[in-house]
């Protein structure tokens, strides 16, 4: 089969977005619309992806460093036909060419695979959709036998043609050799003075090609974004699809309308996810995991039976089986928690490896640290890991007990079963089983009186 090349049109200004950010870089599910389209093209096995850029070209190019993308500059925006023509020099004559759009981010791979499955020199493949309100879209004109004859844009359509409810999505596929023959012959003699890519449909019919039509499972797959309202509508549809998938796969959601999946979320069975949970990047949740309300979890692995309580933020961390996190805890990148650990309220960890059964229950910061098994860290404990230039390591052995309001000035090594008295500032290593107390001596002054106002 001839190679597949994908041309993505991403040169438009997007003035209705009212934004300095190029339209195709506005996010859906936490990822730029254009990046969704590029990822789909990769999943199709495209030999090369040609992305036509114009407005904000430097910004768009800088957003995606990818060797599989060939950037094509359209200096003047003269219509979709003109945009595709800019990519012609990079298209091999024997290639099959699929045209996608940078502001139509959620077309499914399966939909496109079906569309191009039988594409060859003898046909042109078209993706259409039926709409109750087709205003603004190009209409699919068929003959009495039901065969596609042309696409007529809204501004050029007759009153009769405007009653047609089957509309053009803009997505089509055809051989590169045909594109190289037809695109130079396009005319801009139309209501908008543009070179319409859709005019090649009539050319294909005139040259005896058959026009094969397929449709997506859901119209939202091919919904484009021209303003922030449409962006929000697309986001809600996507999130509803994610919620339905999660419930099908074994999660119970407190409210399917109040969950955000902005990446790849994989789950086990019998999960509970409360309202306003946000999942970003690659997140894996094991069996029987509980996610409390208002949690944000990014690029993390949560093992079986773990409970993430309300208002906790986890990023770049591994949480072991049956661990308890929060409420109001923050696990930063590099945190690795073993099974049965507990990270309580207002605790922050960073590059901290915490052994099985260890607890950091309240109001503490543990960074650049290694904790053994069954360590107890009292409230208000701080690892002083930064000297203004470098970060230093704190090591607590198995069974260490750290009293409340302790400062551990790194680098410092506390051996197993050692105990640190509350209120201590530890600057030296502590040997196995020792008690360390490092605080000012208490003085009680008899007969002292509080100052009085003059």
Swiss-Prot record:
Compartments reported by the entry: Cytoplasm
Enzyme Commission code(s) on record: 2.7.7.23, 2.3.1.157
UniProt binding sites for UDP-N-acetyl-alpha-D-glucosamine: 9-12, 23, 74, 79-80, 101-103, 138, 153, 168, 226, 332, 350, 365, 376
Highest rank taxon of the organism: Bacteria
Positions of Mg(2+) binding: 103, 226
GO biological process annotation, one example: cell wall organization
Cofactor(s) for this UniProt protein: Mg(2+)
Enzymatic class: transferase
PROSITE patterns in alphabetical order: HEXAPEP_TRANSFERASES
Pathway, per record: Nucleotide-sugar biosynthesis; UDP-N-acetyl-alpha-D-glucosamine biosynthesis; N-acetyl-alpha-D-glucosamine 1-phosphate from alpha-D-glucosamine 6-phosphate (route II): step 2/2; Nucleotide-sugar biosynthesis; UDP-N-acetyl-alpha-D-glucosamine biosynthesis; UDP-N-acetyl-alpha-D-glucosamine from N-acetyl-alpha-D-glucosamine 1-phosphate: step 1/1; Bacterial outer membrane biogenesis; LPS lipid A biosynthesis
Gene Ontology terms: cellular component: cytoplasm; membrane
Family per record: In the N-terminal section; belongs to the N-acetylglucosamine-1-phosphate uridyltransferase family.
Subunit structure: Homotrimer.
HAMAP family on file: GlmU (MF_01631)
Record-given protein name: Bifunctional protein GlmU
UniProt organism field: Marinobacter nauticus (strain ATCC 700491 / DSM 11845 / VT8)
């Amino acid at each position: 089969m001839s190679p597949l090349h994908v041309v993505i049109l991403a040169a438009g200004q997007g003035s209705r977005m009212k934004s300095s950010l190029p339209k195709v870089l506005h996010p859906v599910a936490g990822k730029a619309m254009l990046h969704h389209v590029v990822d789909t093209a990769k999943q199709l096995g495209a030999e090369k992806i040609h992305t036509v850029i114009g407005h904000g070209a430097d910004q768009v190019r800088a957003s995606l460093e990818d060797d599989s993308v060939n950037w094509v500059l359209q200096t003047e925006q003269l219509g979709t036909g003109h945009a595709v023509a800019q990519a012609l020099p990079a298209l091999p004559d024997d290639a099959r060419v699929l045209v996608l759009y940078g502001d139509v981010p959620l077309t499914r791979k399966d939909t496109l695979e079906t569309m191009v499955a039988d594409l060859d020199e003898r046909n042109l493949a078209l993706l259409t959709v039926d709409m109750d309100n087709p205003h603004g879209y190009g209409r699919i004109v068929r003959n009495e036998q039901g065969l596609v004859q042309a696409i007529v844009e809204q501004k050029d359509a007759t009153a009769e043609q405007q009653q047609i409810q089957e509309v053009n999505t803009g997505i089509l596929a055809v051989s590169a050799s045909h594109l190289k023959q037809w695109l130079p012959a396009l005319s801009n003699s139309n209501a908008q003075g543009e070179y319409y890519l859709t005019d090649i449909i009539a050319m294909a019919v005139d040259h005896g090609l058959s026009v094969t039509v397929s449709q997506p499972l859901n119209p939202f797959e091919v919904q484009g974004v021209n303003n922030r309202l449409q962006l929000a509508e697309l986001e809600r549809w996507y999130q509803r699809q994610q919620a339905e998938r999660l419930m099908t796969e074994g999660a119970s959601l407190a409210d399917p309308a109040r969950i955000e999946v902005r990446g790849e979320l994989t789950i086990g069975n019998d999960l509970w996810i409360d309202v306003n949970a946000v999942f970003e990047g690659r997140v894996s949740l094991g069996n029987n995991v509980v996610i409390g309300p208002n949690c944000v979890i990014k690029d993390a692995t949560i093992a079986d039976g773990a409970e993430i309580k309300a208002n906790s933020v986890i990023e770049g961390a591994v949480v072991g089986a049956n661990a308890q996190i929060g409420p109001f805890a923050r696990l930063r990148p590099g945190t690795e928690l073993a099974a049965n650990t507990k990270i309580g309220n207002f605790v922050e960890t960073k590059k901290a490896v915490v052994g099985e059964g260890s607890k950091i229950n309240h109001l503490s910061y543990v960074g650049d640290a290694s904790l053994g098994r069954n360590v107890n860290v009292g409230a208000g404990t701080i690892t002083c890991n930064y000297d203004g230039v470098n970060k230093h390591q704190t090591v607590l052995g198995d069974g260490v007990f750290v009293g409340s309001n302790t400062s551990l000035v790194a680098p410092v090594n506390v051996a197993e079963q050692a105990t640190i008295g509350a209120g201590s500032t530890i600057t030296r290593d502590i040997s196995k089983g020792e008690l360390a107390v490092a605080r000012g001596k208490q003085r009680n002054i008899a007969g002292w009186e509080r100052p009085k106002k003059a």
